Amino acid sequence: MLAALPAISGYLQTGYEWSDNSSSFFIKRVRLSLSGNIAPKLDYRVQIEFASPKIVDAYLCYRPFDELNLQLGEYKLPFSIENTEYVPLRYEFIEYPLSLCKLMGFNDLCGLSATGRDMGAQLFGGFFRRDGYSILNYNIGVFNGEGLNVRDKNKSKDVVARLTLKPAAGLQLAGSYYWGEYGADYLKRVRYGAGACYDRGPVVVRGEYICGTTGDLDSEGWYAVAGWRVTKTLLPAVRYDTFLENSARSSSRQTNYTAALTWQPVKYLRCQLNYTYEDYAARDVSGNNVVALMLSGIF
């Protein structure tokens, strides 16, 4: 009977941020998750965000074969490496890169603020198993395109596809595609992404390029991350992160340079310190220094 009960987990992320323009304490995330198995090949998950109350995950997943699985509900879109592989408790930085935020539903140019999630269905799987992972992996799905807990505002469905190659343990190469129309006016929303990641042992190296069209606006950006696990509890990392909101205007570029330190002395506590310099190409916008400290309590 106990095996049928859901596993309960969660975390709280809170901290303080100072910049040239402001300073504030903040609560970034407060999440509670319930997950379990309904049957041997059928699992579920429900995750609730309390910082700004909403359901962020609610899905059923049927896993009959390694090569073919079905997921239905609300969950992370299978686009980019960071969106699905680097959840907040694994991520080396406090903030995600600009290109992911602006083009994949975090603080999207189309108006969505959905933490890279949507409601829909996807097929996914992997081929050529070796040492606990599949060398060739795919995801293909259809989604509302409206974000969290929102019914579709048009009759069109958005299509997302990703192909991931893992030639060796810790190494992955991924390409992603998103096509959609959002809102009652069927405005164009197209995204392309390509990236590579090596994360094994002490080494963390990762980079992605993401571009897209939102209505009539073309945008693009990319980031590069490098980190080194000095010990099992200490990880320093740096990131170069640049984004052109309007690809035709160089003055729309923002570039962030971030140095980060993550320290996790025990399983249930994670401490992060970030320094970011925000550089703006626009002549009338000054650069900005940002220092942020965030603590994660995990249960």
What are these regions (language model features)?
Residues 2-145, 155-157, 164-172, 225-228, ...:
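Outer membrane beta-barrel
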Residues 146-148, 213:
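A generic structural motif
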Residues 150-154:
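Active-site cleft segment of glycoside hydrolase catalytic domains centered on the general acid/base Glu
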Residues 18-21, 39, 45, 61-63, ...:
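Outer-membrane beta-barrel pore domains
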